Amino acid sequence: MRPFRVSLGPLLLLALAACSGPDTTATAPSSSPAAPPRPGLLVSSAHPYTADGPAAPTDYGAPGTPHAKIMRELQQQVLNQAGAPAHTSVTCDKKFITGNVKAKCTVKFDDLAVPMDVTASIADRYLTWSAIASVGVLSRTNVGWLWNSKAVNDNARLGTAMCDAAMPDQAVFPFGTTPFFCWYTTAEGSVVEKQVSVGRRGITFEKA
């Protein structure tokens, strides 16, 4: 006697597949963004605009003299570092007329003071000088614009670029990292957080 064989036709196979149903253990990747690290304020895309420069010196000597040149460029140096406009002025405990001069100067950025140690060498028409500051200006407007630009370049989700609410509108800090952070949410839903740092050449964002 030949063995009895049963052939499962296509319709029966389809029915069995339908009865098995979907795999309930599989889960789709979540598109929900991660929660921000803390309450913050949305940053603005508005450029703080860089000031053309300090007001023309009135009590720094004749224009083009070494003293007037240094006075003006000290202010411009602080404006460039801050990345934001302000009313500036500068005072020094010595005048830069001739010879080797070491002076202590203070640049006022609105109501903020940026002290500097200035060294100059002046001979005839030749002038070399340098200025060293230990603090820099943090401007919330500039920080916000820079962070928004980074978020846009990194394809962050719209409306997620934020910085600490406690960050002041303007303040001076020693060069290096500050207590403040900024963050945004990536297209994949993860949060990128960086620490705000004040540098001699401007604001940077460091790994938190």
Model-derived features: where do they sit?
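Bacterial N-terminal signal peptides that target proteins for export
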Residues: 1-8
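N-terminal presequence-like segments and adjacent domain-start helices
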Residues: 39-73, 130-131
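A short, surface-exposed interaction/processing loop segment used at functional sites
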Residues: 125-141, 202-208
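Short, non-transmembrane alpha-helical segments in secretory-pathway proteins
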Residues: 57-89, 137-166
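C-terminal motif of bacterial Sec signal peptides marking the signal peptidase cleavage site
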Residues: 15-18
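Short, low-complexity, disordered segments immediately C-terminal to signal peptides
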Residues: 9-10, 20-41
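Serine/threonine-rich, repeat-prone extracellular segments and beta-strand-based repeat modules
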Residues: 86-104, 163-179
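Extracellularly exposed regions in secreted/surface proteins, prominently low-complexity, repeat-rich
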Residues: 149-208
